[in-house]
Amino acid sequence: MLPTLDARLSAAAELVRPGEPVADIGCDHGKLTAVLAASGRYPKVIGADLRPGPLAKAEQTLEYAGCKDRAELRLGDGLSVLSPGEVSTIVLAGVSAQTTWEIIEKAPWVSAQGGPRLVMVPATRHSDLRRWLWEHGFALAADRPVQAAGRWYAVMAAEYTGKVKTPTFRECLFGLTGQWPEGEGYAAWQKAKLPRLRLGVPDGTELAKEMDELIKGESKG
């Protein structure tokens, strides 16, 4: 039986390009790994996790889905389980923004021309991940807002270009989510957090001014 994906993982699956090898890093119980493998659209599917327990669950998931022979499971830390160039897309779902960029930083071959597409679903700090990606030479190819279990998530795809960008606070807050019908709801959720964040920003700064404008609703997300 094929597992059911929530909105986050469904959106992530749609950003994996058909016909190319893919790795699901931090695969947990292997739901996304199983769906990708069962589709038959990818020449190689790798699921990896740091912990033996979840990886054993992932093996069961693949078996129940009838696609155990179409995916390879690996035990290891982050991208250390992969060889440079082994896959064209890397999925990093369900970890924090900081953990996401720390995983990327430990694999220099990812931050290179012709490197893999990164599909990311940060559990927290969406704005910080966008800023990190832009400041480290990555371009956002997709930035889709989705709701799952009553929470908003941003499902991002990024590719290394080497072009460093210094983004504004507003760009980091909303990214490209305004391109989607769900963008209005995501923007409202992001704005709702601003009053608390504003407390830690000194008055008179450009950041304070931009935050105040957003809080007052003078700018739309």
Where are the regions a protein language model picked out?
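Conserved SAM-binding loop of SAM-dependent methyltransferases across substrates and taxa
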Residues: 29-42
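Conserved SAM-binding motif I beta-strand of class I
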Residues: 44-49
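S-adenosyl-L-methionine
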Residues: 1-20, 34, 56-84
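Conserved class I S-adenosyl-L-methionine
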Residues: 19-28
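Class I S-adenosyl-L-methionine
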Residues: 2-7, 80-81, 86, 98-221
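Conserved SAM/SAH-binding beta-strand->alpha-helix loop
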Residues: 51-53
